[in-house]
A protein has these predicted regions:
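Terminal transmembrane helix and immediately flanking juxtamembrane interfaces
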Residues: 1-173
Length: 173
């Protein structure tokens, strides 16, 4: 099976959808940092990181124009997906400033379901194998995304960009 990594790909010029959503998230969180600037631990560092991410995104777009092939598309998209490991702990910085709303959601669950579905599930499936399966899911969160991305890159390249957009956007939402 030939991947033809360096075969020229005819594609539109400009940002991929996954890069656009990342830049939008980058901009929105930068604005949030500016509003919370005085209360944050390291706002300058966070803003500098965001500027470097934006610069890197545009640099990769420019390099892709020089060599539009599967490999350069892969690099552009995988770098955006790998940034999820940066964005995830970054959300902790913002969540420190917002009140805990768990009680609101627990009350809504009580109202909608007349109970707590998570507790029902735990009582229905108390087996160790079930909890281990969930732990395995958390453990393989990022590797699973990489496996899915590689599958689409190798076997369904025409869907690779859309799949990465869906994964990254669902993370941001």
């Amino acid at each position: 099976m030939a991947l033809d990594l360096f075969k020229r790909v005819e594609t539109r010029k400009g940002l991929f959808a996954v890069e656009k959503i990342t830049l939008i998230y980058n901009l929105l969180t930068s604005i949030l940092i500016l509003f919370l600037f005085q209360r944050m631990d390291h706002p300058w560092h966070m803003l500098l990181d965001r500027a470097m991410i934006a610069a890197m995104t545009f640099l990769l777009m420019y390099l892709y124009r020089l060599a539009p092939c599967k490999f350069s598309a892969f690099v552009r998209i995988v770098i955006q997906m790998s940034l999820l490991s940066y964005w995830y702990p970054d959300t902790f910085e913002f969540n420190r400033f917002f009140p805990n709303l768990d009680h609101v959601f627990a009350t809504a669950e009580e109202f909608i379901f007349n109970g707590q579905p998570a507790i029902w599930f735990c009582h229905t499936f108390p087996h160790l194998i079930v909890s281990e399966a969930f732990n395995m899911g958390y453990f393989f969160y990022y590797p699973m995304m990489l496996i899915v991305a590689l599958f689409y890159f190798i076997y369904k390249f025409e869907w690779f960009e859309k799949m990465s957009f869906v994964l990254v956007t669902s993370f941001f939402i």
